[in-house]
């Protein structure tokens, strides 16, 4: 019996917004990952199973073939580097933006103009480094894994680089968005070997995802 395809997803917004794309392929995940303790979830298609992993680990599972394909944010893929992955489709889900934010009242533009060296907290170190280097801004980057908004409030950093959707969390912590680095959305990523060896099995899912992401439905 042929082993089922494995799709790597992370909990939360990406999982929720991938569900309609799976529906477009005629597939339903059998269990809700927010309620189930299982990390391998069957689907209504015996040829597909879903594994639930951390968002930052999706590219690694796909690159090394533990998953045949997955859904990951552009932010995660940029930090990962994209090696061993084929990225055929921007799914246009989990949309937000990566931005620089500072405490309200901090004159970011003037600090940059004066050539000040800024401490910036972020989990997107590589992307932030490239952004500031391209703009000639001098920074010391501090790697954090969460609660980014806290860093400027306690004097750890002058600014943060983080994902922003509505901006509500920034506002609640008296921070303001001063610069958008790039728009972010989630992409379908496919293991390159799987694309060659399992193309026939993958193709219906890739086609359905592409149609659904473009608003074509099933």
Swiss-Prot record:
Alphabetical keyword list: Amino-acid biosynthesis, ATP-binding, Cytoplasm, Glycosyltransferase, Histidine biosynthesis, Nucleotide-binding, Transferase
Homology family: Belongs to the ATP phosphoribosyltransferase family. Short subfamily.
Keyword Transferase among record annotations: yes
Subunit structure, as described in the record: Heteromultimer composed of HisG and HisZ subunits.
Protein's organism: Burkholderia thailandensis (strain ATCC 700388 / DSM 13276 / CCUG 48851 / CIP 106301 / E264)
Pfam families xref list: HisG
Pathway field: Amino-acid biosynthesis; L-histidine biosynthesis; L-histidine from 5-phospho-alpha-D-ribose 1-diphosphate: step 1/9
Transmembrane segments: none
Subcellular locations according to the entry: Cytoplasm
Broad class of the protein's primary localization: cytoplasm
GO cellular component, as recorded: cytoplasm
Known role: Catalyzes the condensation of ATP and 5-phosphoribose 1-diphosphate to form N'-(5'-phosphoribosyl)-ATP (PR-ATP). Has a crucial role in the pathway because the rate of histidine biosynthesis seems to be controlled primarily by regulation of HisG enzymatic activity.
EC number(s) per entry: 2.4.2.17
Superkingdom of the source species: Bacteria
Protein's name in the database: ATP phosphoribosyltransferase
Coiled-coil regions, chain positions: none
Domain notes per entry: Lacks the C-terminal regulatory region which is replaced by HisZ.
Gene: hisG
GO terms for MF: ATP binding; ATP phosphoribosyltransferase activity
Enzyme class: transferase
Biological process (GO), any one: L-histidine biosynthetic process
Reaction equations catalysed: 1-(5-phospho-beta-D-ribosyl)-ATP + diphosphate = 5-phospho-alpha-D-ribose 1-diphosphate + ATP
């Amino acid at each position: 019996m042929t082993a089922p395809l494995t799709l790597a997803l992370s909990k939360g917004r990406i999982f929720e917004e991938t569900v309609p794309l799976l529906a477009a392929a005629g597939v339903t995940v059998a269990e809700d990952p927010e309620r189930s303790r299982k990390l391998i979830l069957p689907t209504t298609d015996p040829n597909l199973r879903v594994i639930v992993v951390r968002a930052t680990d999706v590219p690694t599972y796909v690159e090394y073939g533990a998953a045949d394909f997955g859904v990951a944010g552009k932010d995660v893929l940029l930090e990962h580097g994209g090696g061993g992955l084929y990225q055929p489709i921007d799914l246009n889900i989990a949309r937000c933006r990566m931005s620089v934010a500072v405490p309200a009242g901090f004159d970011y533009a003037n600090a940059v103009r004066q050539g000040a060296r800024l401490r910036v907290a972020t989990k997107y170190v590589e992307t932030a480094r490239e952004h500031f280097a391209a703009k000639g801004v001098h920074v010391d980057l501090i790697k954090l894994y969460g609660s980014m908004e806290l860093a400027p409030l306690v004097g750890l950093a002058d600014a943060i680089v983080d994902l922003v959707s509505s901006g509500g969390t920034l506002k609640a912590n008296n921070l303001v968005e001063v610069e958008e680095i790039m728009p972010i959305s989630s992409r379908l990523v496919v293991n390159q070997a799987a694309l060659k060896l399992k193309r026939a099995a993958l193709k219906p899912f890739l086609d359905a995802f592409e149609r659904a992401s473009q608003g074509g439905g099933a």
